Amino acid sequence: KKVIYLKLDTRNILNHKNKILKKFIPKYVFHFAEFSRIVPSFKYIKDCWSFNTLGTFNVLLYVIKKKSKLIYSGSSSGLGKEINEHLSPYSWSKSKNIELIKNFSNWFNLNYTIVLFFNVYGQKQIKNHYMAAVMGIFEDQYSKNKPLTVIRPGNQKRDFTHVDDIINGTILAAIKGGKKEYQLGSGKNYKVIDVAKMFGTKI
């Protein structure tokens, strides 16, 4: 089927003059357009706040207006102890957005499903950029025959999930999911040092 790509800004989605956007009534709105890294969120806190807080607020208003179902990508960084949500501007913004979504559901009958991602990797992943995740960094270094960078001792455990599995899980959650959170992960944790060793190169 035909796909039409529109270059938009979530912070201005309600006031955008694009005719297609105004007329189109989406069944689902997949909202993944946010600042999405923990460490860079300290340096780029203004961007994190602008996209994650203001942008998401406007997306919620748009979804309510269109009477669509929102599929929101939460963050696994806020799981575990309650204090985790306060560890970074990114974690805090994602946690508060989930609270806001649930409040919108109570206040305005917003239909939603939240999916939580765990260290997504795969084709077209960001490799050489401050937004790159560990798997993308490893791939970039490996392709350039450079040693892989691991902060000692490298025992941090992560659940790594391929992007194809994330896509399939997200679509399934959109169609069948209720007003709750779904963790999309492999269920297996690997040490960062062990993942680096899988590349079979210098570390």
Task: Give residue spans per PLM region.
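N-terminal Rossmann-like NAD(P)+-binding domain of SDR-like oxidoreductases, especially those catalyzing
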Residues: K1-V120, T170
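Short, solvent-exposed loop/helix junctions and linker helices
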Residues: S50-T53, K94, N128, A132, ...
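C-terminal substrate-binding subdomain of Rossmann-fold SDR/epimerase-dehydratase oxidoreductases
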Residues: Y142-I203
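Glycine-rich "substrate-gating" loop/helix at the edge of Rossmann-like oxidoreductase active sites
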Residues: L87-Y90, F118-A132, R152-V163
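Short, flexible micro-motifs
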Residues: V39, N58, S77, Q125-I126, ...
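Hydrophobic alpha-helix immediately C-terminal to the catalytic Tyr-X-X-X-Lys motif of short-chain
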Residues: K96-F104, V134, F138, V195, ...
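A short beta-to-alpha transition loop/helix N-cap that caps and shapes the active-site region
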Residues: K81, Q123-K124, V192-I193
